[in-house]
UniProtKB/Swiss-Prot annotation:
PANTHER family the record matches: 30S RIBOSOMAL PROTEIN S20, SMALL RIBOSOMAL SUBUNIT PROTEIN BS20C
InterPro entries according to UniProt: Ribosomal_bS20 (IPR002583), Ribosomal_bS20_sf (IPR036510)
Residue ranges of the region described as Disordered: 1-24
Its biological purpose: Binds directly to 16S ribosomal RNA.
HAMAP family cross-referenced by the UniProt entry: Ribosomal_bS20
Entry protein name: Small ribosomal subunit protein bS20
Amino acid sequence: MPLHKSAEKRLRQSEKRNVRNRARKKELKVLLKNMQKLIDTSADKNVVEEAYRSAVQKLDRLGVKRYLHPNKASRKKAQLTKMLNNYVKVD
């Protein structure tokens, strides 16, 4: 338990931030899994591209706001792009 008032405040703030960070990362995880599921089930090309756009948009936002390291966001975007290109090439 914190002994000082400032330490109590830091604890409260870090707990709030932790919840917020987890929620944002969970949203991203859901988007990525959704795109993978669409590709695995051979969904319509337009639906997959829409899922790709929303995932890339979320990655950009998280990278800029530093919820993810910008390099990790960039790497994930490259992986998604490669996945999408392979899917489009197969169809």
